[in-house]
Amino acid sequence: EGRPGVAATLRALNGALGRPAALWVKESGARNLRHRDFLAPRAALSAAFPGGQAPPEAVSAVPSLRGPAVLPLRVCRQTPAGLTVQVRRPEAFQRLLGPLPGPAPSAAGARTGCVVLHCPALRGPAALQPRHLRSVLLADHLAQLLRTQGVGVRLVPALTEERSWDVLRQLRICWPSGSGGSSLTDAVSALKAALGRCPCAAACEQGPGTAEGVIFKVHLKSFVEQQGLVGYDPNLDLLLVTEGTLWSLAELQEAVLQCPVSDLPALPASCFPSQSSCCSIIHVVNCEEEFQQQQLDVLWRILDPGAHTALQKHLVCGPVKVTNPSSPIGADQYFQLRKRQMYEASVIKYGELAQDEAWTEVIDTLTMAAIRFEMLSTAHRSQITLDLQNNSISTKGTKSGAFVMYNCARLATLFDNFQRAVERGTYPPLPPVSELNFSCLREEGEWLLLFNYLLPFPEVLQQAAQLPPPSSGIRITANTETVCKFLIQLSMDFSSYYNRVHVLGEPFPHLFDQMFARLQLLGAVRDMFHSALATLHLPPLSQI
């Protein structure tokens, strides 16, 4: 039998009642999970069946539901809340804790589809601001999520040596660099020639009244109206085209051409449903620069009427508001400020820190986590408010990246302590999973960790990488906050369990079964932490 999943189990439950509609829901609250794992609410049953009563033969068939990804189920009961069913928990632990949790098996196969992620914030000579950093971090995270689902990703633009990119390196943002070379120069020449033939473009001679560097004027509005394009700013009209404008388009064209032929089939339906057989272009842009990107979008459509330009979409980030800034703050200053605050908060919690390389690395990682969670745990459409006061960063808050990293480190310490105890002869080594007795896992928190986190984790990654199907508009939304929110909630539930349960107990043989089952569960939780953090380019900490 394969790895159980939430979606497959819900499909089987709905099918058992003979209704394709989603009657059943998965429970997640600790209180309800004491009595039921899945519920078909009374209101939904009343809408689907006369008198709200499902056929008795369908109800009695629920425990016999089988399938490669269907959870083993117990008796289905009629209650005041509706139909309820519980999972056969020891068997569910056995099936889920055998293989390591991670992306769905299909994601590990051959790459399918290709997405070009374009981040205009990385162009131009101006220093990065926090609002730029938000769109770059979002693109970096989305790229990693898409890769976990087997999608090829191209990142544009390449970083040039004309600017300092220290803050990107400090945040472990993986972005390509390079100058482009002669191929881009040739592409720019071809675009110039195309502009010369374009009926809505006029060449500009340098002289009085002409902005420096402008080589063409292009009337965008007539093209937008003629093509019936939807979702563009009504003020789009005259665009002054420079060499830099054409260079941007040439880079995008080259990225599309670099998508291998094997990448050109449609993206997996889980990532971009109903996609045509062409690579997709997503412009990840902050709201203040959305207008300029729309201009570039339309210009590219004019010069290159290929299928890929028609698939351009804009993922727009909301504003980043900085409270109480003494002066405008750049991304570099923001990182250094958060690093200093993280160091001071750590001193308060742990005492004066040794100035060695290990602790410097810990503070750097905590700072990365604090900034990534600050920027990514809010839906990308919403405004972020950055509080730069000293008390805004803490190692104690449950909503922060530092809290997530702290709990990840607690797991590392647990397994380090266990390994040391094994080496001392205090405990025997962890037996093979086939020899473990999962009926020992009776704590409420243990089922919570399995049912709310380990079970749906592959589907959480899939949801986070999912992009909406093509539509007539140009804006799209993505679930880029999903992984951060998942990690925060996981950390809270793990912390609550770990504070309540003594995992490494007294070295008595009659207690080993429970300890080993708990270690197997928490080993899977640790691996899940690591997999989720990897999509944020955050290395797990072994100590804090």
What are these regions (language model features)?
Residues 1-544:
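Non-catalytic interaction-recognition regions
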